[in-house]
Every structure is written in C-alpha cells, then in structure tokens.
C-alpha cells in the first residue's frame, strides 16, 4: 500500500517561506556541509512525495546523470537553457503530471527554479528549452514565469532537485491567482499523488564567473498587467 507523507503538507505550506528574488549569496553542498541548510530545515517539495519504494516512475536526462554536474549550458553562466528530460514508468491511472525543480538554500528556504503543471500524462520526454509541454508557473528565484537557471553568487557546490509527480487527477487551480505559484499547486496535489521521481543535479560556479545581463520574462506583477 502506498504510504503517503502528505498528511503534513498543509502545515508545511503554512510555514513555507520563499527566498527573495535573487539567487543565494551563501554556498553549501547540503546538510552536514558548511554553508548548507540548517539542521531541521524542512524541504517542502520533498515532503509532498509519497514514500513508495516500489514505484516504477523514473526521471532522467540525456544531458546529465543523477548526482552529476549540470552542464554549463543549462545554467546562468551558459545559455540559461532548460534541460531535456525523459521519464518512464508512469503508473496506471495517471491523469496529470507536475514537474518542479527546487533547491534548499543555506537558510533552509525552498527556492523554486522551474514549475510546470497540467502536463499530459502521455508525454514521455521534453526537449531542451521546451515550454509547450504543460503550463508554467512562477519561479521564486526571480519571481518570473520562467525556468530559472542555477546562477548562485555563492561559492561551493549546490544541489538542485527535479521532481516529477504523477497525479490521479488534474490539480484544481481554478481559485489560484495567475500566474500560479508552487503553494496552490502543492495544495491541489494533496491526495492525488500516485508516484514521484527525482533527478538530482549539482552545480558549482566557475571561479571568476562574471555577472551577465540576461533577457528574462516580465516579473509577476508586470505579467499580470
């Protein structure tokens, strides 16, 4: 039987704090490493995943293997392109898919780098820079409807997690403000998650990397006008 950890989701959402619209200034490899998230930090996206060891859902990328470094072209120091992805093992009864890329910063805040929802369950892969495979939500890194490429100003290796959720029904976001943020998506997913799969990627900014001006979509308040 699928054991779910979603019972704590409502409480987690109430306490969810997102970072300011800029990439983190502090480095860190993760829990236990200097500069990593504080002890007891709650990873809100991870908390939504069901604890199903028998799940067949698998998320991969032809550009990067799980646990390896994200190629430069998919970061803010390269092309800022979103990575190509593929998945297999979508469970029977799946009616919708959700994709979230996030990072737990040194202050324990969940940063959303990529949010795609209402993905057709028949979809099995997406190309580099794809935007037409679902609906895109807000990236909290820059407060824009976009894929926010890893571009941290802080030193050290950082981990970013892409999670694919298989849902038994489309998340009801009819009452959510537009453009959509991750909070209502996670809330609407409650009780509908059949399976979830992660792809963990790492990135360390090159020494002496300079800031560059990037063409970006309008911020949330600008997009609403």
Predicted regions and their residues:
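Positively charged n-region of N-terminal signal peptides that target proteins for export
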Residues: 1-5
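Bacterial N-terminal signal peptides
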Residues: 7-17
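N-terminus-centered regions that define maturation/targeting leaders and the start
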Residues: 21-225
């Amino acid at each position: 039987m699928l054991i779910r950890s979603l019972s704590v989701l409502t409480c987690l959402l109430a306490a969810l704090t997102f970072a300011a619209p800029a990439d983190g200034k502090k480095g860190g490899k993760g829990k236990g490493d200097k500069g990593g998230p504080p002890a007891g930090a709650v990873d809100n996206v991870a908390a939504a995943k069901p604890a199903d060891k028998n799940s067949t859902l698998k998320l991969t990328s032809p550009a990067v293997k799980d646990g390896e470094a994200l190629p430069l072209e998919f970061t803010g120091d390269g092309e800022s392109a979103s990575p190509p992805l593929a998945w297999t093992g979508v469970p029977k009864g799946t009616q919708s898919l959700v994709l979230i890329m996030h990072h737990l910063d040194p202050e324990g805040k969940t940063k959303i780098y990529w949010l795609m929802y209402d993905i057709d369950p028949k979809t099995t892969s997406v190309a580099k820079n794809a935007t037409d495979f679902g609906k895109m939500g807000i990236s909290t890194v820059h407060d824009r409807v976009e894929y926010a490429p890893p571009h941290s100003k802080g030193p050290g290796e950082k981990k970013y997690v892409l999670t694919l959720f298989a849902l038994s029904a489309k998340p009801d976001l009819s009452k959510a403000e537009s453009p959509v943020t991750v909070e209502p998506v996670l809330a609407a997913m409650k009780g509908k998650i059949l399976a979830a799969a992660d792809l963990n990627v790492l990135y360390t900014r090159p020494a002496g990397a300079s800031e560059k001006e990037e063409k970006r979509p309008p911020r949330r308040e600008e997009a609403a006008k």
